[in-house]
């Protein structure tokens, strides 16, 4: 009972403190302006369920082009200015052999990871062609599970050389010009027991080192990644052995763990998770610095991220087997509410705050499962997360500017977070500023005081803004009803204070 009283007193004190404070933002004059890499708005696609087959690739569908690519998906991806797409996995890649997916003599294979058949009709050539139509960079993740360093470097040869066995095979397959694929990753989540071909800490560093050496011998200016985590016990030995061969370390994050039971967290519970991605980023930056690769010598690629993990019961339990029908629960429209939209905005804000080191991020995945786009045979739906990505790729300016913030708390049980999350961007001349502000409160409008003088501006009578809010915190989009989308509004200002709508992402424009 005494413990409960202490906890209640602590919570009450935090609530009173929160009520006493004001929410304010101002430019940090000491901070350094950074031109962030738009690759942080990247995407990911895996041979899982209906992401590729029946998703982005559906030959014979009236909505597909002559190559079998869904044109509505391509157009939607152009709307969010997709800069890069990671493929083919994901866990799938750890039993994928790229040679099975090229040429005219392809055969379907049994995918041991997801325990189903893959027809191999969407392989390297189709992927690169699809990326060209989307207008994005291809980013290939190689098989470091059941594959070998030589197989990885052969794949680089197939994509990038005009000479040798594999470059000539690409030409024979109808593609005489090299693809010049720049981004390559050694492995996927090889630290995990769920991964087929998982490695020990002692095995992983040498595996990465030798793979990277072979791959770079083919393409000198390749950008090379390796599967890592924010755990120093894994990543420090990796960097000690192989850091000198790498440009990036790859980390992943899903914060609503729905592997076995599809019981999505509530809006407020999701908001309590919004600080977690930045903690992982900071831990990973600390690992890089400890290993002697700080200051951008090696950068971070958050190349799989989403609020909610994919629902695939019993994956990794080889005795129990895979529940195929359960995968359909990933596509329930009502799952993807304003919680997903706001969490995604907070994630992107964290990437921007550390954009000197976080250089690439890939939302996981682009289509179906937990994707920003839901695709069926008759059309598609842009989920709430799609419009988060749309706002960040269309309305932000190109330079991140550090800001000083003072935010009150949003408290739920024994957990708390700041009620607001914000970043500031500007154009090259520092004439046009855009604040990206997230209000995590499910019900309350939150007043925010803006220091206009720190931007060299006078307080205007009103501000232009783009707002993504929906009708409630649990609002979502479905086929034929995409009402959760950005709205242009005018925000009134009184004594430098502007009202931020509840459960919203608000982009405030200051000119």
Indicate residue ranges for each PLM-predicted region.
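Bacterial N-terminal signal peptides that target proteins for export
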Residues: 1-8
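Hydrophobic h-region of N-terminal signal peptides that target proteins for export
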Residues: 12-20
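Non-catalytic accessory regions flanking glycosidase/transglycosidase catalytic cores in CAZymes
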Residues: 20-234, 239-248, 277-278, 282-313, ...
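Glycine-rich, phosphate-binding/catalytic loops in enzymes
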Residues: 202, 318-319
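Short glycine/proline- and acidic residue-enriched helix-loop micro-motifs
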Residues: 216, 263-270, 330-331
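Active-site cores of enzymes that catalyze phosphoryl transfer or operate on phosphate-rich substrates
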Residues: 245-248, 267-272
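Active-site His/acidic residue clusters
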Residues: 253-269, 315
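Active-site gating loops and adjacent loop-to-helix segments of metal-dependent hydrolytic enzymes
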Residues: 319-326
